[in-house]
């Protein structure tokens, strides 16, 4: 029996090996090119994807670099605009202060002229009133023959009337 088992086992091995070689030959003859084509296509696709990813990464780096340069340029421009606005503001501030100073000086001079004019007019008015009072006082003194005390009292009463008016 052992011989039978050994021969069956040997037969099974031979049939199995024959089947494997036949299957290998058939695959090699009919499907091997397609199978290797799939692997080659897959390899090419992976290589293309890697190249595309590398190109996309390089383009992204270039884009990042460009955006950083644009941002730096925008910051520089913003700084220049702010500096120009500050300069313009200081110039306008100085101009407004100078104009206000000139206006205040002009108003002060006009006020001084108005005061001087009012002073002259008031002085002329006082002179006229003093002259009128002097004439009036002289008339009254001439109408009355008064001694020194009566003249002094008369002058004082007219001055009091002048103070009340």
Swiss-Prot record:
F-type ATPases have 2 components, F(1) - the catalytic core - and F(0) - the membrane proton channel. F(1) has five subunits: alpha(3), beta(3), gamma(1), delta(1), epsilon(1). F(0) has three main subunits: a(1), b(2) and c(10-14). The alpha and beta chains form an alternating ring which encloses part of the gamma chain. F(1) is attached to F(0) by a central stalk formed by the gamma and epsilon chains, while a peripheral stalk is formed by the delta and b chains. GO terms for cellular component: plasma membrane; proton-transporting ATP synthase complex. F(1)F(0) ATP synthase produces ATP from ADP in the presence of a proton or sodium gradient. F-type ATPases consist of two structural domains, F(1) containing the extramembraneous catalytic core and F(0) containing the membrane proton channel, linked together by a central stalk and a peripheral stalk. During catalysis, ATP synthesis in the catalytic domain of F(1) is coupled via a rotary mechanism of the central stalk subunits to proton translocation. Component of the F(0) channel, it forms part of the peripheral stalk, linking F(1) to F(0). GO terms for molecular function: proton-transporting ATP synthase activity, rotational mechanism; proton-transporting ATPase activity, rotational mechanism. The keyword Zinc does not apply. Keywords: ATP synthesis, Cell membrane, CF(0), Hydrogen ion transport, Ion transport, Membrane, Transmembrane, Transmembrane helix, Transport. This is ATP synthase subunit b. Its main location: membrane. The keyword Protein transport does not apply. CDD domains: ATP-synt_Fo_b. InterPro entries: ATP_synth_B-like_membr_sf (IPR028987), ATP_synth_b/b'su_bac/chlpt (IPR002146), ATP_synth_F0_bsu_bac (IPR005864), ATP_synthase_B_chain (IPR050059). It is a single-pass membrane protein. It comes from Streptococcus thermophilus (strain ATCC BAA-250 / LMG 18311). The chain crosses the membrane at residues 5-27. Belongs to the ATPase B chain family. It is found in: Cell membrane.
């Amino acid at each position: 029996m052992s011989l039978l088992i050994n021969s069956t086992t040997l037969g099974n091995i031979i049939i199995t090996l024959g089947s494997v070689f036949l299957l290998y030959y058939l695959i090699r003859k009919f499907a091997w090119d397609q199978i290797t084509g799939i692997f080659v296509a897959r390899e090419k696709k992976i290589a293309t994807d890697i190249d595309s990813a590398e190109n996309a990464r390089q383009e992204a780096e270039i884009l990042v670099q460009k955006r950083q340069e644009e941002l730096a340029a925008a910051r520089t421009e913003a700084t220049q605009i702010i500096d120009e606005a500050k300069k313009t503001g200081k110039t306008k501030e100085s101009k407004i202060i100078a104009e206000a100073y000139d206006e205040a000086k002009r108003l002060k001079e006009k006020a001084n002229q108005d005061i001087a004019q009012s002073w002259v007019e008031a002085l002329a008015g006082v002179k006229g009133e003093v002259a009128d009072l002097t004439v009036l006082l002289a008339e009254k003194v001439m109408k009355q023959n008064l001694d020194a005390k009566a003249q002094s009292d008369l002058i004082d009463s007219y001055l009091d009337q002048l103070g009340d008016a």
